[in-house]
Structures are given as structure tokens and as C-alpha cells.
């Protein structure tokens, strides 16, 4: 595995044995450390590269469709004048702290605009979270005859952010049950058990809200939706996060109906940041089986 593991104590193994070295890595070519090429006596280029696009063509992986979800609040920040009374109240403690740090007298009024890169540090906005969840539940790829959103990972900013996402989901969709959307990070005691359940098609959760833990190294072929709800700065991590949805999955929608693609909802401008494109998501116009049966009963009643 020719990236991070070739350095430190593991490097001694390669120095000790006089043999042919074959290095394999999923790290994007532009991000591979020069020392890796030096170790393998290469001139900053790999001997062979098998791209994601080639793997899609050869039907080893599945492509994604992309929706760049515009959130003025996330991308451009928050203007004080645009805040509701409730949202201003949420920021009062922040402003009180800043007044103390800046030596501003307590009796003096103080507030300021919040920049886009401060959003998740200072404010978890329910309206934004609700929009993210509504977009997923409305336009995400579905299973079980349209009754359920397919297995989904929501990449959250931090533990508090992830907690609020789960709380809002349970308030908006109580009929789905408490296990439908669950938080997975290292602060959750039974996170290994939840991950094991998430990997099983017939078990809940259907939606995993992850803080770093599911960004890399997890293989769940049933994943149909990825929600990028945090800002990503690492190209390596970004590519690996996309990889969570690329696995093949046979008979996912029924006998002979295999997974053909997956959806990505990007709320934080990550695909623009990394100059990555994708075909547009198809807006959902299909009704679930329950909805179709209800409409049929109405027609019969008429």
C-alpha cells in the first residue's frame, strides 16, 4: 500500500529485503507524496493508473449523479439583519463571549455578521438542516418500492452538528422510527454495532450521520445517497468519500434490478472547490407504493 504506510517504521521492511517492490494506492496521482515515487524509483508518475472512469466503463464501479445544493447561509455567511429573533437569541452567548474577549463593556450593544467559514462553529440552523433532510427524502434514490430512501451517509461537521441532524430527522419524520436515522462517531458507545447493522440491507439505520468514521474504509454496496454537509479541504479524503457509493450491488431493487448509480447532494461547494463535475440528479416524480395504493382507493371511491 504505497502511500502513508511506506514511511516510519514500515519503511525499514522495504530497506531490509532486496526484492521487487509493487506499490498500490487509491490516492489521487496529484496527491501522492514525492517520497513514494522516490522509494519506487519513479519520476513523479506511476507506471500504471486505473481511473474511476475506466472502472465505471468496465462495470467494476458505479457512477454518481450530482446535485449542487445552494445554501446562501453556508456558502456566504449570515447577515445579522436576515436572522430571525430565535436565531439571534442562539448567537447571544457567542456575542457575549466575544465582548468579554475584546474588552467591550457589557452594557454596550454588540453583534456582527457571521462569515461562511464560521457557520458550523457558531450556529446549527434548523432551517438549513430541515432543507437538507427534505431534499434527501424527496429526491434521494429510494428502495422498497419507493417506501424508503436507500442506504445513505450524511457527512456531518462535528458531533453536535450530527446530533442536531438526527434530532431534526426524528422531529420531521417520527413515523420512520428512532432507528431509521442514527449518529455514528467515536463518541457513540455502540458505534461498531450500529455500523454492522448499517451494512446489512434488512437492518436499520437507513441513514447514517457520520462524523469522520464513515468517510473512508467502509464497504456498503447498498449505499445509494451521499450527503456532503461539511466543507472538505483534502482531495484525498474527498475522493475516498465519493468512493463510499461506488460499489456494485446486485438485485438491490428486486430480482435482476441491480444498482446502476448513486446520488450525491453537495451543500458546501466541495465539488466546485475540487473542480469536479457530475451529471445532474433526476428530480423524483415517482410515488411510493403506499401513495399509489392510496390514490387508487380514492379513484375507486369516486
Features from the language model and the residues they span:
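Conserved RecA-like P-loop NTPase helicase motor core
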Residues: 176-285
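Interdomain helical connector at the RecA1-RecA2 junction of SF1/SF2 helicase-like NTPases
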Residues: 34-149
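Conserved H-loop
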Residues: 26-27, 212
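Conserved C-terminal RecA-like helicase domain
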Residues: 98-210
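Long, largely alpha-helical accessory region at the distal end of helicase-like NTP-driven motors
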Residues: 112-124, 131, 268-302
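Conserved catalytic network of the ASCE P-loop NTPase/AAA+ motor domain
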Residues: 13-17, 30, 58, 143-147, ...
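Short, conserved "post-DEAD/DEAH" coupling segment immediately C-terminal to helicase motif II
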Residues: 3-24, 30-38
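Amphipathic alpha-helical transducer elements in NTP-driven molecular machines
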Residues: 4-7, 49, 126-130, 207, ...
